[in-house]
């Protein structure tokens, strides 16, 4: 089993690339954003964790994500401590996900994790793929999500530069031109990896 990690700036198209690995290479994808969403929605321990740090963000046992975002945007020591605990939970889920797939006939696992390198999630990867888009396209994608300028700037500050990401990655995929172009890059990377490890799809 080969573990691929995706790194890239916010709005670079990591989830799109992950979906293409799933669709065209039959890779299984660990979507950290989706995992965190489910934890906020359904995990009583995480809901209590949120409440212990940010009481106003939990109402009648439900996490108010808009209120919680307010604390994220402050990004103070309290948030950093909370985030560290949450990351530990996500790390364990990711570890279990990888272990579970290692027991099946799974060839590729793709980790779609924000701050993959910054939070050291890349340490369990066999290869890291840098996903890159031009800055104008990134901003357009984020505006469609309704992201504020302040949120964009904060997240950008937390992330490595494109140069650092590229330096720490094995491959680069450029998004934003066409679906076929992205798919061809995905398939080319798989071909290169298979050549390195001496196996065939």
Curated annotation (Swiss-Prot):
<protein>
    <recommendedName>
        <fullName>Dephospho-CoA kinase</fullName>
        <ecNumber>2.7.1.24</ecNumber>
    </recommendedName>
</protein>
<keyword id="KW-0418">Kinase</keyword>
<feature type="binding site">
    <location>
        <begin position="11"/>
        <end position="16"/>
    </location>
    <ligand>
        <name>ATP</name>
    </ligand>
</feature>
<keyword id="KW-0808">Transferase</keyword>
<keyword id="KW-0067">ATP-binding</keyword>
<comment type="function">
    <text>Catalyzes the phosphorylation of the 3'-hydroxyl group of dephosphocoenzyme A to form coenzyme A.</text>
</comment>
<keyword id="KW-0173">Coenzyme A biosynthesis</keyword>
<dbReference type="GO" id="GO:0015937">
    <property type="term" value="P:coenzyme A biosynthetic process"/>
</dbReference>
<comment type="similarity">
    <text>Belongs to the CoaE family.</text>
</comment>
<dbReference type="GO" id="GO:0005524">
    <property type="term" value="F:ATP binding"/>
</dbReference>
<keyword id="KW-0547">Nucleotide-binding</keyword>
<dbReference type="InterPro" id="IPR001977">
    <property type="entry name" value="Depp_CoAkinase"/>
</dbReference>
<dbReference type="GO" id="GO:0004140">
    <property type="term" value="F:dephospho-CoA kinase activity"/>
</dbReference>
<keyword id="KW-0963">Cytoplasm</keyword>
<feature type="domain" description="DPCK">
    <location>
        <begin position="3"/>
        <end position="201"/>
    </location>
</feature>
<dbReference type="Pfam" id="PF01121">
    <property type="entry name" value="CoaE"/>
</dbReference>
<comment type="pathway">
    <text>Cofactor biosynthesis; coenzyme A biosynthesis; CoA from (R)-pantothenate: step 5/5.</text>
</comment>
<dbReference type="GO" id="GO:0005737">
    <property type="term" value="C:cytoplasm"/>
</dbReference>
<dbReference type="InterPro" id="IPR027417">
    <property type="entry name" value="P-loop_NTPase"/>
</dbReference>
